[in-house]
C-alpha cells in the first residue's frame, strides 16, 4: 500500500517537472506549424445555419441551448434513462434513419454523452464529473500542498452536511481516499521522508 502511494506521489512529481522536447524540423513539420494565410477575413465553419450546442422542441415549444442544457441536466440528475428521454423527445417510435434527421436528435445524443460521462465519474467537483484517476491525482496534490480536511470537504461539497448525508454523498469515497493519503503522508514524514527527489 505504501509502495503504491510512493509510486503515485513520484509520478505526479515527475510529470510536474517534465519539459516538452523540441520537435525535429523538416519541411513538412515547418509547413504544418506555419500560420495559415488566407485572403478571407473570416472563417465559416457552420453550414445551413446550424447552431452549436443542442436545441430541442418539447411540447411544441422550441428550447434554446441554455434551456435544453438545463432540461437535460435535470433529467440526468433525476435518473431518467436514455429510452425515457428518447420518448419525451418524440424519437422512440421512429426508425434510426428518421430519428437521425429529427430536430431533437442532437439533444438525445447530448443526453447520452452526459449519461455516459456520469456513469464513468468517480466524484463531482470543480468543473463537473471527474474520473477516478483525475480525482486521485487531485487528492494527492491537495495532500502534498497541505490542504486541511475542512478545505477538501468544502471542495468536495461535503462541508456542513450531516453524517448521514456525507456517507450517502457521491464524493464520500474520494474524501475517505484523501484522509487515507493524508495519513500515509504523515507516516512517511514521521519516518524522515520529507520531499521527493529525482
Swiss-Prot record:
Signal peptide range: 1-20
Entry keyword Transmembrane helix: no
Motif (RxLR-dEER): 43-52
Induction entry: Expression is induced during host plant infection.
Cystine pairings recorded for this chain: none
Comment field on protein domains: The RxLR-dEER motif acts to carry the protein into the host cell cytoplasm through binding to cell surface phosphatidylinositol-3-phosphate.
Entry protein name: RxLR effector protein CRE4
Species per Swiss-Prot/TrEMBL record: Phytophthora infestans (strain T30-4) (Potato late blight agent)
Gene designation per UniProt: CRE4
Amino acid at each position: 500500500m505504501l509502495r503504491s502511494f510512493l509510486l503515485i506521489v513520484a509520478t505526479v512529481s515527475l510529470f510536474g517537472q517534465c519539459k516538452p522536447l523540441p520537435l525535429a524540423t523538416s519541411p513538412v513539420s515547418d509547413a504544418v506549424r506555419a500560420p495559415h494565410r488566407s485572403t478571407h477575413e473570416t472563417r465559416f465553419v457552420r453550414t445551413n445555419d446550424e447552431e452549436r450546442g443542442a436545441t430541442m422542441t418539447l411540447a411544441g415549444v422550441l428550447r434554446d441551448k441554455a434551456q435544453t442544457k438545463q432540461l437535460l441536466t435535470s433529467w440526468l440528475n433525476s435518473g431518467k434513462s436514455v429510452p425515457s428521454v428518447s420518448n419525451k423527445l418524440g424519437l422512440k417510435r421512429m426508425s434510426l434513419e428518421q430519428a437521425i434527421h429529427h430536430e431533437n436528435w442532437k439533444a438525445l445524443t447530448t443526453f447520452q454523452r452526459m449519461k455516459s460521462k456520469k456513469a464513468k465519474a468517480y466524484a463531482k467537483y470543480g468543473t463537473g464529473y471527474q474520473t477516478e484517476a483525475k480525482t486521485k491525482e487531485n487528492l494527492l496534490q491537495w495532500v502534498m500542498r497541505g490542504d486541511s480536511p475542512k478545505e477538501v470537504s468544502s471542495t468536495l461539497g461535503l462541508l456542513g452536511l450531516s453524517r448521514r448525508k456525507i456517507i450517502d454523498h457521491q464524493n464520500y469515497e474520494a474524501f475517505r481516499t484523501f484522509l487515507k493519503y493524508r495519513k500515509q503522508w504523515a507516516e512517511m514524514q514521521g519516518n524522515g521522508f520529507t520531499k521527493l527527489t529525482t
